[in-house]
Amino acid sequence: MFIESFRVESPKVRYGAGEIESEYRYDTTELVHESHDGASKWVVRPKSVNYHFKTNTTVPKLGVMLVGWGGNNGSTLMAGVIANREGISWATKDKVQQANYFGSLTQASTIRVGSYNGEEIYAPFKSLLPMVNPDDLVFGGWDISSMNLADAMTRAKVLDIDLQKQLRPYMESMCPLPGIYDPDFIAANQGSRANNVIKGTKKEQMEQVIKDIREFKEKNKVDKVVVLWTANTERYSNVSVGLNDTTENLLASVDKNEAEISPSTLYAIACVMEGVPFINGSPQNTFVPGLIDLAIKNDCLIGGDDFKSGQTKMKSVLVDFLVGAGIKPTSIVSYNHLGNNDGMNLSAPQTFRSKEISKSNVVDDMVSSNAILYEPGEHPDHVVVIKYVPYVGDSKRAMDEYTSEIFMGGKSTIVLHNTCEDSLLRAPIILDLVLLAELSTRIQLKAEGEDKLHSFHPVATILSYLTKAPLVPPGTPVVNALAKQRAMLENIMRACVGLAPENNMILEYK
């Protein structure tokens, strides 16, 4: 059964004017390694910590600024939001299609809230806490190409022609601001697009981004802004002492116009200095140590890295299943070919390396979770190949072969073919990242014994479900298994309204 909304009634939950407060008991464990008389043992002790959550329920007018607004992802997202807002329908070869937000966790998925008369009851994910309606978002952004959003949509070749014709009047007046362009960080083949760039030194470019954010906020009268990088994958930046290892060194390097400070890092610095959340949707190491340090000092949300949309999402499910079932993956070979601008940029070895790292690390935590299957240091052979094939356009082909060891020396091979409509999968993920980042800034919490409420850690692990290479605070375990990531996100939101985590025990029927 499906219900549109619900209200929690509990002595530990209070709905006030503009806020929800909850008292929540967090049940976990602590491990102790004890030694007695030369013998050692592990002891697991149940542990409970009481938390107080406070969520601001006033939904702001939210502005979204995309770096790479005129790219395939940006133009597709813009088109989708307009089509939903205006209730547009269009003819395909199969049917008359209605606009929707399929593929969005916040807009098109559900959560279980309990059971009624023996039937499980589900409600929209977005009903847990008040969120910004995507139809109300105000968009803007930067691009190194001056092409307006209507022409960018046509260039992308993602959406049906009938839909494009209906959207053109809404989008042809939308033009991106000049963007930061450094040909050393992306493929040389992107130079032909770069006719709309911010001139000057790196410091001047960063200051222009700050100015752009302020003017966008003032012009559109928005309460908050979230900035998201959906531009080209950059090569990895060098990280070294004295260059970008601390906030002081990073800012000094910007002042000195150091060549190794990437455009994405400049955007991120500008956002952090303005107190604006910044999300990195590409695989490069935007968040160098000095930038993470700056975000923590300024208590400004940062999140990333790299949208998790197609092949990697499948991998994070399948490997989790195999290892959890006691099956040992020994070889994972992933092949992709695509023909959009992302594929053209990734045809350069230095930018492909960033993507290869992001895609390859996704199974690490699952492998390390099972020492029965894997010896220390042992890891599946894992190869990732990406090729540029212009004809297939945005319709990326992903082919995977998983070879595993099974019972008594047997071998199992699974082969998958996945046609990933790249931008149509990524656009709703961008939407979720923006909405959840904004929501995160309205949640405060404190553990028992702490003096005052505080925000989540600025490094937003809550966004991990949506990214290939989750950015986590120093010393925090990295979790890539998709089911764990979704459970973490959902259960934190449940805690904000005093609901227990969804553990699927269903003891009332046992």
From Swiss-Prot:
Disulfide bonds: none annotated. Its main location: cytoplasm. One of its GO terms (biological process) is inositol biosynthetic process. It holds the Pfam family Inos-1-P_synth. Coiled coil: none annotated. Transmembrane segments: none annotated. Keywords: Cytoplasm, Inositol biosynthesis, Isomerase, Lipid biosynthesis, Lipid metabolism, NAD, Nucleus, Phospholipid biosynthesis, Phospholipid metabolism. It is found in: Cytoplasm, Cytosol; Nucleus. Its EC number is 5.5.1.4. The keyword Protein biosynthesis does not apply. Its cofactor is NAD(+). One of its GO terms (molecular function) is inositol-3-phosphate synthase activity. InterPro entries: Myo-inos-1-P_Synthase, Myo-inos-1-P_Synthase_GAPDH, NAD(P)-bd_dom_sf. It catalyses: D-glucose 6-phosphate = 1D-myo-inositol 3-phosphate. Pathway: Polyol metabolism; myo-inositol biosynthesis; myo-inositol from D-glucose 6-phosphate: step 1/2. The keyword rRNA processing does not apply. GO terms for cellular component: cytosol; nucleus. NAD(+) binds at residues 70-73, 143, 180, 190, 193, 230-233, 281-282, 306, 309, 340-342, 355, 393-394, 422-423. Key enzyme in myo-inositol biosynthesis pathway that catalyzes the conversion of glucose 6-phosphate to 1-myo-inositol 1-phosphate in a NAD-dependent manner. Belongs to the myo-inositol 1-phosphate synthase family. This is Inositol-3-phosphate synthase.
